[in-house]
C-alpha cells in the first residue's frame, strides 16, 4: 500500500536480522515487483544472501553498517550498491572511513539527535541523511508546557 500511495521513491527493508536466507531474497524480489526503488538489509545479512539478491533483483541493495569492523570491499563485492551507516555516535566517523576508501559509493546515514551531529555526518561524506521527526505527542508536549505556564503557543 505504501508503494502505491507514495509519490517519492521507497526503499524497502527486507530483513537480514531475524528474517534470514532465502526469505530475504524472496522479499527483495517481491519488493522490486511492487515498485520499490531499492532494498535495505540489516547488518547480520550474510554475504551469500546479498550475492543471491544481486543475482535475483535489478534494484540497488542498501547494506547497513553499524561498526568499524565491517569489510566494506567484501560487502561491495557481494552486491552492496549503497551503504546505510547507522552507528550511533560513531556514524560520522564511519562515514568518513568509507568515503576515504570508496569516494564514489553512495552513503545514506542516520544523522543523530542534533543539527550539529547531522552536519558532522554530512561533512564526513554522507550523500543522504535519514531522520526521524518528533512525534505529534512530542511536539504537543512543548505546546502544553507553554499553556501551563500561561504563555501563548509559538
Predicted ranges, named:
Residues 1, 13-20, 36-45, 60-67, ...:
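Catalytic beta/alpha-barrel core
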Residues 35-45, 81-94, 124-145:
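Glycine-rich phosphate-binding active-site loops on the catalytic face of alpha/beta enzymes
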Residues 29, 48-62, 67-81:
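Eukaryote-skewed repeat-based solenoidal scaffolds used as protein-protein interaction platforms
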Residues 4-33:
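A glycine-rich, hydrophobic loop/mini-helix early in the fold
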Residues 5-15, 54-64, 99-110:
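Short beta-strand/loop segments at the ligand-binding rim of alpha/beta enzyme cores
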Residues 22-30, 70-78, 113-131:
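Catalytic cores of alpha/beta
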Residues 52-56, 97-98, 119-123, 133-154:
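C-terminal helical cap(s) of enzyme catalytic domains, especially alpha/beta-barrels
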Residues 3-4, 32, 50-58, 76, ...:
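Surface-exposed amphipathic alpha-helices with a cationic face
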